Amino acid sequence: MKLIKADNYQTWYIENLDKSIIIDPWLTNKLQPKGSFFIQRNKANDTILTDEEINKVNSIIITAPFEDHLHFDSIKLFSESTAIYTSNMVKKTLIKNKIKNPIEILDESGTVINSIKVKALPTSYPYYHSTFSIFFEDQNGNSIFHEGHRVNFKYLKNNKINADISILTAEESKLFGFIQLGMNY
């Protein structure tokens, strides 16, 4: 597996056997959803991915229904035949917004994408109803754990989930100054 941090925010790219998965793609310079007071972000570069790498993307994973994960302009950059893997909540939003791509639900039992076993795992408070973390394992046993919000350490310990690489949110953020939204390392 080849892993690339595709931007300076939270888009990730995983390539295996000349095909790739893109996670939470935000491939434009601006994220300013209409009517959104809370999310107004800009970045210098849209992505570090090459055109060749973008053309290898045959699967998109959307981990959360929030605008910085579910970015419609970025999804529309890919062919309508590009499969989207996500939650039931996000699937409803995609359909409501007339996204025509095939949409599959990820869960703990897992599915195989590009010869990688992909499992959706539970996150921690306050995100456990709306987001999921992801566990990837390739045909050689190499593994990656991805969590874009808050890790459910109890679940990982109880289920003996270990990974070669962990992708975690490294900055703490709090809503109204006291509800912890991001990790605090």
Predicted regions and their residues:
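Metallo-beta-lactamase
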Residues: 86-141
